[in-house]
Amino acid sequence: GVEINVKCSGSPQCLKPCKDAGMRFGKCMNRKCHCTPK
């Protein structure tokens, strides 16, 4: 995945930031959001 500079404590928090970044799916790893490119 692609790490974006968004802090998180759970994967659901990453859905919108990943969408806003033009990607889909978000996972929280090491307190940062990781997105899957389209």
Swiss-Prot record:
Q: Which organs or tissues contain this protein?
A: Expressed by the venom gland.
Extract the signal peptide range. none
Q: Which cysteines are joined by disulfide bonds?
A: C8-C28, C14-C33, C18-C35
Q: Where in the cell is it found?
A: Secreted
Q: Where is this region: Interaction with Ca(2+)-activated K(+) channels?
A: 26-33
Q: Which GO terms describe its molecular function?
A: ion channel inhibitor activity; potassium channel regulator activity; toxin activity
> What Pfam families does this protein's entry cite?
Toxin_2
Reading the lineage from the top rank, the first entry is Eukaryota
- PROSITE patterns documented for this protein: SCORP_SHORT_TOXIN (PS01138)
Q: Which UniProt keywords apply?
A: Disulfide bond, Ion channel impairing toxin, Neurotoxin, Potassium channel impairing toxin, Secreted, Toxin, Voltage-gated potassium channel impairing toxin
Miscellaneous comment in the UniProt entry for this protein: Negative results: shows weak inhibition of large conductance calcium-activated potassium channels (KCa1.1/KCNMA1) (Ki=1560 nM). Shows weak or no inhibition on Kv1.2/KCNA2. Shows no effect on Kv1.5/KCNA5 and Kv3.1/KCNC1.
Function of the protein: Potent inhibitor voltage-gated potassium channels Kv1.3/KCNA3 (Kd=0.65 nM) and Kv1.1/KCNA1 (Kd=41 nM). It appears to block channel activity by a simple bimolecular inhibition process. Induces a transient period of fast flickering in the channel openings, followed by an almost complete blockade of the channel. Its binding affinity to rat brain synaptosomes is 5-fold higher than this of KTX-3. Binding of the toxin to the channel is associated with significant structural rearrangements in both molecules.
State the similarity comment: Belongs to the short scorpion toxin superfamily. Potassium channel inhibitor family. Alpha-KTx 03 subfamily.
What's the protein called, per UniProt? Potassium channel toxin alpha-KTx 3.1
Organism per entry: Androctonus mauritanicus mauritanicus (Scorpion)
Q: What is the lineage of its organism?
A: Eukaryota, Metazoa, Ecdysozoa, Arthropoda, Chelicerata
